[in-house]
């Protein structure tokens, strides 16, 4: 979606986006190196998402995440590198540190 938007510093209000049918959120903000904050996306419906791989990877300027603890990640099988190269102070909910794996045929 916004992958590799290296000059992107802020986003419009994307909190009301209908994400209920989204299956892949992988790389959504990957490479947005100047993005300093995100709108409140805590109410996004993520019950159908299967991949969040590299979602926030290389977001060097991102200092905090919205409260994504509300997200339903029951179907997510790939969270590899979800916050790779982000600041150590980024508050990542514990449940997002578990990588679920699945075999695809």
Summary of predicted features, one role per range:
Residues 1-105:
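Negatively charged
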